[in-house]
Design a protein with these regions (language model features):
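Auxiliary, metal-adjacent structural segments of Zn-dependent hydrolase domains
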Residues: 1-43
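Surface-exposed patches in mature extracellular/periplasmic domains of secreted proteins
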Residues: 1-7, 24, 79-84, 124-133, ...
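Solvent-exposed loop/turn segments at secondary-structure junctions
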Residues: 10, 29-30, 52-55, 69-70, ...
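Short pre-active-site segment immediately N-terminal to the catalytic Zn-binding motif
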Residues: 46-63, 104
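Active-site recognition of the HExxH zinc-binding catalytic motif
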Residues: 61-78, 110-114
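Post-HEXXH active-site segment of zinc metalloproteases
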Residues: 74-105
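Metalloprotease/metallohydrolase-associated module, dominated by Zn2+-dependent proteases
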Residues: 94-150
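Pan-zinc metallopeptidase signature
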Residues: 126-195
Length: 195
């Protein structure tokens, strides 16, 4: 999705002075490189990392995971995704235990990515592989809600809007989407907050 990012990306921590200087050296050139080079016109929207994927199941799962991010991007757009990328640039792929600027955006994105990856991969290949992601992401919660039919993948996808910037906001959107299951959704997401 990098070719489609039109908003600035860069380091975004709690130290504004450090971020300023780092972004002059790192963030600004990265944004300009993405938006004003050949990357903009020929880079693929999705890159599937095949390294260390030694089975069809693993490659299929990785493909589903990355395509789930592409579907999420289609819902939220460039400004939201620039915050996601900036979080990863600042804190690493899964960050630091739901801390830092835009951690919630990463949590929602990875929760969706791993949950749909596991749901579809397990449906195709059988078995029960469930990724939590980092401990604070807890994709298993969303996976179980979908697997048990409490919410559908379409329900979750419909909730992935630019307003959903934390897992708690995702919970509230799912409760509004499925009011009959309000308490079940609340209970499942409570396990997220208690870990």
């Amino acid at each position: 999705m990098l070719p489609r990012i039109t908003h600035p990306i860069g380091r975004d921590s709690n130290c504004e002075l450090a971020d300023f200087f780092i972004n002059i050296i790192y963030g600004l050139p990265a944004t300009l490189f993405i938006n004003h080079t050949i990357i903009e016109s020929i880079a693929p929207d999705v890159i599937i990392g095949g390294k260390n994927r030694t089975s069809s199941r693993a490659f299929y799962g990785q493909t589903i995971h990355e395509l789930s991010h592409a579907s999420h991007f289609s819902q939220v757009g460039s400004a939201y995704w620039a915050k996601y990328i900036s979080y990863i640039m600042t804190y690493g792929a899964y960050g630091d235990d739901n801390k830092g600027e835009n951690a919630g955006i990463c949590g929602v994105g990875e929760m969706w990515g791993y949950a749909i990856e596991d749901l579809l991969t397990n449906d195709k290949y059988g078995g029960l592989d469930i990724h939590k992601g980092a401990d604070w992401i807890r994709a298993d919660i969303l996976h179980d809600l979908m697997k048990e039919g409490i919410v559908s993948p379409n329900d979750v996808f419909d909730c992935l809007t630019p307003l959903i910037t934390t897992q708690n906001k995702l919970k509230e959107a799912l409760q509004a989407k499925s009011p009959a299951n309000h308490n079940i959704i609340e209970t499942r997401f409570d396990t997220l907050n208690n870990n």
